UniProtKB/Swiss-Prot annotation:
GO terms for biological process: protein folding. It comes from Yersinia pestis. GO terms for cellular component: cytoplasm. It is found in: Cytoplasm. Belongs to the UreE family. This is Urease accessory protein UreE. GO terms for molecular function: nickel cation binding; unfolded protein binding.
Length: 231
């Protein structure tokens, strides 16, 4: 196993490394969005190199990171991250609304997203929601809940990633594929529960620790009553 403890540079962001590796052969380490949020993991590259990633805590890999370079063979190990697409909801037009309208719309949007158990990050007057179901289903949820007046679009996750802090990226992309993918399309008035936004956080574990067969409980507060969920 080849131990990787430092990132040498980034071929997409660093012009020095871009020039240095312009004629190099890339041996890709392909990671999904959850793997990319781990500072420690073990995985093989496309050419079969057994790589042990052991970075400082809170350091995460980015698309294009250079992990190793053999100058003699001109082969570089480079990270390729496959991220989910993201629904981007533009809230800018709400600035022209009255305070009451703004608060009401934001509250109802939070209810609609939370009712789907969709993760979300709000930044730059936009809401970023990683896709966990087909775009047609997410489009249906937005329109059924009456948010067609809010512009929204679907973009590549790689386009959003540079706008996020590490913690925001971990929330948005870390384990989004494990989110419940059920979809409720009823009007908010028809939903008897869920008056608040639920964002199910990320469980981050070191190597060798997993959620296997054990259960754990967590609670949500809904207005004036509480209830527990068992996983």
């Amino acid at each position: 196993m080849i131990l990787i403890e430092h990132i040498l540079g980034n071929v997409k962001k660093d012009p020095v490394w871009r020039e240095k590796l312009k004629d190099a052969t890339f041996d890709l380490l392909i990671l999904d969005q959850r793997e990319a949020q781990k500072s420690r993991c073990r995985k093989s590259s496309t050419q079969g190199l057994d790589l042990g990633i052991s970075l400082d805590r809170n350091v995460v890999l980015a698309d294009g990171d250079v992990l190793a370079w053999d100058e003699e063979t001109n082969v570089a190990v480079v990270v390729q991250i496959n991220l989910r697409d993201v629904m981007v909801i533009d809230l800018s037009e709400l600035k022209s609304r009255s305070p009451d309208e703004l608060i009401k719309t934001c509250f109802e949007l939070g209810h609609a997203l939370g009712n789907q158990h969709w993760k979300a990050v709000t930044k730059h007057n936009e809401v970023y929601v990683p896709l966990t179901v087909a775009t047609t289903m997410m489009d249906s949820v937005m329109r059924t809940h009456g948010f067609q007046h809010l512009p929204f679009r679907f973009v590549k996750g790689a386009e959003i990633l540079p706008l996020l802090t590490n913690s925001e990226a971990r929330l948005l992309f870390g384990g989004a594929e494990d989110t419940d993918t059920h979809v409720h399309v009823a009007s908010p008035l028809d939903e008897p529960h869920g008056s608040g936004l639920h964002i199910h956080g990320i469980h981050s574990h070191e190597e060798g620790h997993s959620h296997g067969d054990h259960d754990h409980d967590h609670s949500h507060s809904h207005g004036d009553h509480d209830h527990d969920h068992k996983h």
